[in-house]
From Swiss-Prot:
It comes from the Bacteria. It comes from Serratia proteamaculans (strain 568). This is Probable endonuclease 4. Binds 3 Zn(2+) ions. The lineage of its organism: Bacteria, Pseudomonadati, Pseudomonadota, Gammaproteobacteria, Enterobacterales. Keywords: DNA damage, DNA repair, Endonuclease, Hydrolase, Metal-binding, Nuclease, Zinc. Zn(2+) 2 binds at residues 145, 179, 216, 261. Zn(2+) 1 binds at residues 69, 109, 145. Zn(2+) 3 binds at residues 182, 229, 231. It catalyses: Endonucleolytic cleavage to 5'-phosphooligonucleotide end-products. CDD domains: AP2Ec. Endonuclease IV plays a role in DNA repair. It cleaves phosphodiester bonds at apurinic or apyrimidinic (AP) sites, generating a 3'-hydroxyl group and a 5'-terminal sugar phosphate.
Amino acid sequence: MKFVGAHVSASGGVDQAVIRAHELEATAFALFTKNQRQWKAAPLPADVIDKFKSACAQYGYGPGQILPHDSYLINLGHPVTEALEKSREAFLDEMQRCEQLGLTLLNFHPGSHLMQIDEDKCLARIAESINLVLDKTSGVTAVIENTAGQGSNLGFKFEHLAAIIDGVEDKSRVGVCIDTCHAFAAGYDLRTEETCEQTFKELGEVVGFNYLRGMHLNDAKSEFGSRVDRHHSLGEGNIGKTVFSYIMRDPRFDKIPLILETVNPDIWAEEIAWLKAQQ
């Protein structure tokens, strides 16, 4: 069973995201629970929480089909203590919003060392940040996303993800989300059946499929190994359609949100229908 959808807008309230996902005939969706480019947000009103839960029940979306994403401003590996604390507070708020909405996953980019501390120290800070927030929340899993490795962003190697998981005390509440565009840009080839086999074998050996909690299905405008994060519509970029068909046929990707963040929302419904047809 595959859960397929897109990162839909929550404009007008988080309950509207559910309706937009349903209109795409999606069986999964992602959303921001607050403005992703602001630090602070008003608390979720009780009536909006109720509307969100009612819409999920009405349209058949369980927590395992929904992959909320945190703010882009958060850096859980920030080298400067004051800025690190600000990120940790914001991440806690994001986790608490998920708790309120009855959601069990929160997807986030791990963090950046900003050329001020070494990789290992930054990865340890990220794990420490996760531990602090998991201690203050319950029921929500921290889902680390791999990155393309732009700038000083960590998470572009599977080993980075494994190192963070290793530092998290409650292994039952940490997982990973693999973005195909990011992986490709970071040097993990996905253009053929053979390279898909190799890349996902490596993921299984280094991180473990038991930690896989979601996928972002994106083609890439960026070149292989370029460390540049530029998404494209499925089949229109440098990856091609093989990997997406591969994922839809492989049971290791069952029952997790498979989320489009492709560049043209106007064709999401078509892309979702095409993905479903690959099974």
